[in-house]
């Protein structure tokens, strides 16, 4: 079974939390029993999260050797110039090593998304922009660290697709069961 969930902002990509006070978890969304997250989205990120009850499928979805592209819409602080975008495309050096090259483009206008709660801070004197970033890795907070490394701090991060699966019309907290056969074999 493969479940597509639009993970809201402020929710952990796990079913329990022992911190005090406890944070929101996947347990509140009425997901099918026995599924678990195949990959993660950090607490401050939102969007597509895949869940499955199939171990081999989870491996194919998360192992970097299978190169499942992950696509994000990223609101950044600043006005990206050509050199910053090219650096992201070429791959940047992070503290855990260089990233693979990425597909990056500036979106001409802000994507139509649901409101975030709490809203992203607005600074009238500092411009912001939206980027579409596609990577085939999945390091901890990778996209946030990549944009920060070129001087563009991330304000909002929404994963919109993983491989052949996309959010489509799912609203935050909504989920659907989908076809797991869309996983491409490793190249």
Swiss-Prot record:
Function field: Responsible for synthesis of pseudouridine from uracil-2457 in 23S ribosomal RNA.
Transmembrane segments: none
SUPFAM superfamilies reported for this sequence: Pseudouridine synthase
InterPro entries: PsdUridine_s_RsuA/RluB/E/F_cat (IPR042092), PsdUridine_synth_cat_dom_sf (IPR020103), PsdUridine_synth_RsuA/RluA (IPR006145), PsdUridine_synth_RsuA/RluB/E/F (IPR000748), PsdUridine_synth_RsuA/RluB_CS (IPR018496), RsuA_PseudoU_synthase (IPR050343), TruA/RsuA/RluB/E/F_N (IPR020094)
GO terms for biological process, alphabetical: pseudouridine synthesis; rRNA processing
Tagged with keyword Cytoplasm: no
GO MF annotation list: 23S rRNA pseudouridine(2457) synthase activity; RNA binding
Entry keyword annotation includes rRNA processing: yes
Superkingdom, natural source: Bacteria
Protein name per its UniProtKB record: Ribosomal large subunit pseudouridine synthase E
EC number: 5.4.99.20
Keyword vocabulary terms for this entry: Isomerase, rRNA processing
Enzyme kind, highest EC tier: isomerase
Family as reported in the entry's similarity comment: Belongs to the pseudouridine synthase RsuA family.
Catalytic reaction(s) noted: uridine(2457) in 23S rRNA = pseudouridine(2457) in 23S rRNA
Pfam assignment, any one: PseudoU_synth_2
Annotated Gene3D superfamilies: Alpha-L RNA-binding motif, Pseudouridine synthase I, catalytic domain, N-terminal subdomain
Catalytic residues as annotated in Swiss-Prot or TrEMBL: 42 (nucleophile)
